[in-house]
A protein has these predicted regions:
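A short, N-terminal "cap"/entry segment at the start of jelly-roll beta-barrel domains
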Residues: 1-44
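Conserved short histidine dyad/triad with adjacent acidic residue
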Residues: 33-63, 83, 93-97
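Structural motif
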Residues: 45-49, 69, 105-107
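Well-ordered beta-strand positions
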Residues: 51, 70, 91, 101-102
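Glycine- and acidic-residue-biased ligand/ion/polar-headgroup-sensing regions
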Residues: 54, 63-79
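Hydrophobic alpha-helical segments of small multi-pass membrane proteins
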Residues: 66, 90-92, 110
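Ligand-binding loop in jelly-roll beta-barrel domains
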Residues: 94-119
């Protein structure tokens, strides 16, 4: 086995790493932020850690590809009334529409296959 080239590995700790503010295509920033090591993908695609501040509601969106996430901290209220808590592993099939609200903030490990499409 050959040694790992330092440029082939990135490591960040979610407790002290710098998150990047997520800015929507229309320029709006709602306070959510992303920690993503793969800079070959657009911010928010592929695997990343997603942080929502207390009181934030995401915009309604449709998934263009599957979404999967694990709630690491906090609580997430889905638009259909489902309440997700730390430890919940969630899968949304391609084409699913929803939005989410967090009363006290939350941290998620997320994989999103493709860009989301805004819906009302």
């Amino acid at each position: 086995m050959k040694p790992i080239n330092p440029s082939d590995r990135k490591i960040a700790n979610i407790r002290d790493a710098a998150f990047t503010a997520f800015v929507y295509p229309d320029g709006a920033a709602l306070g959510d932020a992303i920690l993503q090591l793969d800079d070959d993908l657009e911010l928010g695609l592929g695997f990343h850690v997603y942080r929502m501040p207390a009181g934030m509601t995401t915009r309604g969106h449709r998934h263009n590809g599957h979404e999967q996430f694990l709630i690491l901290e906090g609580e997430l209220h889905e638009s259909d009334g489902t309440i997700l808590r730390a430890g919940d592993l969630v899968f949304y099939r391609d084409g699913t529409e929803h939005n989410s609200y967090t009363p006290n903030g939350c941290l998620l490990a997320v994989h999103i296959a493709g860009p989301e499409i805004a819906v009302d």
